[in-house]
Amino acid sequence: MISLMLSSSSPFRSSPFSHASSAALDRLPRATKLTTELASVSPWFEERKGRIAKVFDKKEVGISTYDTAWVAMVPSPLMISSGEPLPCFPDSLLWLLENQCHDGSWAQPHHHSLLNKDVLSSTLACILALNKWGLGDQHIAKGLHFLEMNFDSAMDPSQITPIGFDIVFPTMLDHARSLSLIPTLDQTMLKELMNMRDLELKRCSSSPDMEAYLAYVGEGQDRERVMKYQRKNGSLFNSPSTTAAAYIASPNSECLKYLNLVVNKFGGAVPAVYPLDIYSQLHTVDDLERLGISRYFVTEIESVLDQTYRCWVQGDEEIFLDASTCALAFRLLRINGYNVSSDPVTHCVVGHMNKDVNTALEVYKASQLTLYPHETQLEKLNSSLGALLQDQISSASIQSTQLHAEVQQALDYPFYAILQRMANRKAIEHYNFDPTRILKTSYCLPNSGNKDFLLLSVEDFNRLQAMHQEEYKEFERWFVENRLDELEVARQKVEYGYFTAAATISGPELSDARMSWAKNCVMISVMDDFFDIRGSVQEMEKIVELVELWDVDISRECCSNDVSIIFSALKQTISEVGDKGSKLQGRNITPHIIALWLDLLYSYMKEVEWSGSCSNPSFDEYMSNASVSFGLGPIVVSTLYVVGPHLSLDMINHSQYHNLFTLTSTCCRLLHEIRSDERELKQGKPNALPLYIAENGSMSKEAAISEMITMSNTLRKQILTIVLDNNSVFPKPCKQIFWNMLVANQLFYRKDDGFWSKELLKVAHQIVHQPILL
């Protein structure tokens, strides 16, 4: 019998108040309600919220020198009398002439020092554009000098390589050489670049998965390959440069229509991607949710998601023809309860994603949201992309520190195995101020790297933490007042109990829910240790008897000191949450909580009986009892009654409630059994893993673990399906409590018994005690 959250061997340091004297106890401050007066609010808090709300109306897109250069190369369909073409977009040419840097390059302002390959590519494209129309001889000369002085960057492995650079840049160099523009470049390096280009083309041409990639980076080299990817708006991949190159190679009225649209919208300089509205808006929503401040922008977020869902239903190409947008839309829509199919995500081409880590990461996170048995392709995508991203980590090929951390987190902590506040803190700590993204060229993602996002999230995190710290003091006072510090096995339970509460139920208005969760966690751990290790059979039976009688004067009962302490603390805890829950629900809910505790105690006694008789139950018989002895009922249901929504008797008796209860209990128990079999066998206790092996003949332990993990994964998907169903009778905040419990156990048992993890000890301290400092 092991408790849901707490282990008898937990390595947490003892509570600082475990042995507090009565005098010290009296000096402890009483916690105050901070729902209306959290820690002091900075005068800029509301101002930042207002500025963030306005970003949903912003649709600014950063300009791209590279794309502008290709647009500037486009000839006009009109011919002068001599038959020579004119530039179709003279404003783009003018922009090139007016925006060369002093060093001769056409770098973006304040470009990153690792983006020299991008600068080389953009500068060469500008040179070719000006040369095509016989303009800017001095600009061209300065640009060529820059290329000569910085050409070695093209082969520098420490530099960030834009998508397709190994094809695009050598191809432009070839064209420049044919025009006798670059006679002084290092010929050995030039030859090496050409060889790399040829090898890359050969490698990609042999893979059907790379066809779209070649069309994107081919810059009009293969009309048949490129034009099959033309979209309804006339573009190729929503890329002005790819579309311009395709038009130059073979004029097409739809391509020209798209280019006219982009130039008319943005003026001479064009962006690297257009349109980008859906992805930009979704990225903003994702940032706010990851940083833990989405509750301040519910209306704006709902508007974005509703509009995205309409576009999804209508089959909008901006979603379905871009892997990043499709994956992000799918993930945010599904996790927010919209009914969306995973089929579009599974059509994302994996072949070229090793060249675009951002896209690979986006699709990988989406692929974690498998719900249904038929979504096998989504699971395969998850497996293949997980391996790809792990290779990127192992080979140290991700040069961005923030992106490396984000990929590592996604691999280590899938969304179903990381607590809310834990994820929020990691997102804050890894927040990337640099809005630069890399495709064929660099561009700035609108609203990415927004300083207000970070400042608001840090202040909000610390304000909530200040409230949690006050609650924690009250929690420790409860621990000491109920003499739980006198039970040696219970001394290390306080922090884990409150950590899981604060990390999953963090809202300022949910103090009662946090305290109910945390106190019941500790009580179950105390009871679990007592039935496992400390208590005699007579003492166990006495505890059961006292809970059955309930209204007893413990001072008149003949029982041990341990039994007296445990029953008194349990009665006080149940009575407290019962009173609060009864007031909120408008009916007496205490008998239900007592009944849940009795079910738990009866299941404990069944395990004591099995251990004492040395008899082994069947796997199914064991799991039926073990799902109860795991202790989910008292923690979760007590919390349900004080988390907010009204829970009628019809809801509590509804099959959906019982189904969710059983699924979650069983899934959590399976996770525990897989990671604790050796310890429990040493204690002479039955465990599901050896029982499962015994019932399946010669099955190896590894095979049994694999099958039990598959069982737990299936249960997790069923649970999430219920939680995300917006049409269910059970209130969403209540379903979320079940999900929080599952996530906590997924975290603790994702690799081994997490109660031994120094990493989780550190996380618990960070969430409850350590403010974020900028």
From Swiss-Prot:
Sequence positions that bind Mg(2+) 3: 672, 676, 680
Binding residues for Mg(2+) 2: 528, 532
Molecular-function annotations in GO: hydrolase activity; magnesium ion binding; terpene synthase activity
Residues annotated as binding Mg(2+) 1: 528, 532
Motif DDXXD motif per record, residues: 528-532
Protein name per its UniProtKB record: Diterpene synthase 3, chloroplastic
UniProt cofactor note: Binds 3 Mg(2+) or Mn(2+) ions per subunit.
Transit peptide (first-last residue): 1-30
InterPro entries, per database record: Isoprenoid_synthase_dom_sf (IPR008949), Terpene_synth_N (IPR001906), Terpene_synth_N_sf (IPR036965), Terpene_synthase-like (IPR050148), Terpene_synthase_metal-bd (IPR005630), Terpenoid_cyclase/PrenylTrfase (IPR008930)
Residues noted as binding substrate in the record, renumbered to the chain: 528, 532, 669, 672
UniProt xrefs under PANTHER family: ENT-COPALYL DIPHOSPHATE SYNTHASE, CHLOROPLASTIC, ENT-KAUR-16-ENE SYNTHASE, CHLOROPLASTIC
Species of origin: Salvia sclarea (Clary sage)
Record's keyword annotation contains Signal: no
Compartments, as annotated in UniProt: Plastid, Chloroplast
Chief site of localization: plastid
Cofactors named for this entry: Mg(2+); Mn(2+)
Pathway it works in: Secondary metabolite biosynthesis; terpenoid biosynthesis
GO biological process: gibberellin biosynthetic process
Entry similarity comment: Belongs to the terpene synthase family.
One GO CC annotation: chloroplast
Record keywords, A-Z: Chloroplast, Hydrolase, Lyase, Magnesium, Manganese, Metal-binding, Plastid, Transit peptide
Free-text comment about domains: The Asp-Asp-Xaa-Xaa-Asp/Glu (DDXXD/E) motif is important for the catalytic activity, presumably through binding to Mg(2+).
